[in-house]
Amino acid sequence: MKILFLADEESKMYWEYFKKEDFKGIDIIVSCGDLNPSYLSFLTTMVGVPLLYVHGNHDDKYNVKPPEGCICIEDEIYEYEGVRFLGLGGSNRYKPGENQYTQKEMTKRVKKLWWKLKRKNGFDVLVTHSPAKGLHDGEDTCHTGFDVFNRLIEQYKPRYFVHGHVHMSYGRQFIRLDKVGETTVINAYEKYICLLYTSPSPRDAHE
């Protein structure tokens, strides 16, 4: 399965200079948050594949104008062609507002998923906006990651953990790829493509 991950900044190549051939072979698009809802609607319409999304900390506008034709996977395990995507959007709470959570609040969200996790026998791809604590995160309150994400990775060993929130312009804080045990960690800032094999085959590929 060829997956296009997006986060935080709209790609001019994909929007202003859209060419269908740039999406050849893409099976599904996944947004990790903080993207214009019109951008997401445009992509799912023009590319003609499902688009899954979680909320970033700046996505309160989705309440008024959600991304049309797209699928919100907040607190859900969405299965597509045998691949299970678990969505947990939002950032560490740093001011009053929506799509922000304390460490305790995010832990509570995860605990409520116990039955879905049991029924689906875990998940393959963890899709979040925020990184995990101590993994690709920042030192400031806003960009501190969630510790419960580390526990999810340790317990369920997903193929991928994909997040946004930490931009390339942040310098040393930006790490595109990492590995934690059996899990590949991806910062999806702007765009990132990976090929996830759904049957025994060579290791997954990245672009």
What are these regions (language model features)?
Residues M1-T44, R119-G122:
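N-terminal active-site segment of His-dependent metallophosphoesterases
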Residues E16-Y17, L35, Y39-G48, D60-G69, ...:
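Metal-dependent catalytic neighborhoods of phosphoester/phosphodiester hydrolases
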Residues V49, F123, F149, I153, ...:
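Proline-aspartate-enriched helix->loop->beta-strand connector
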Residues F5-Y14, H55-T144:
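Conserved catalytic scaffold of divalent metal-dependent phosphoesterases
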Residues F5-A7, I29-D34, L52-N57, L126-H129, ...:
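Active-site neighborhood of phospho(di)ester-bond hydrolases with catalytic His/Asp-centered motifs
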Residues Y197-E207:
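Single conserved hydrophobic/aromatic residue that forms the stacking wall/gate
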Residues I29, G48-L52, P67-D75, T183-T184:
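Active-site regions of enzymes building and remodeling cell-envelope glycoconjugates
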Residues L6, W15-Y17, I77-E81, L152-Y156, ...:
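Binuclear metal-dependent phosphoesterase catalytic core
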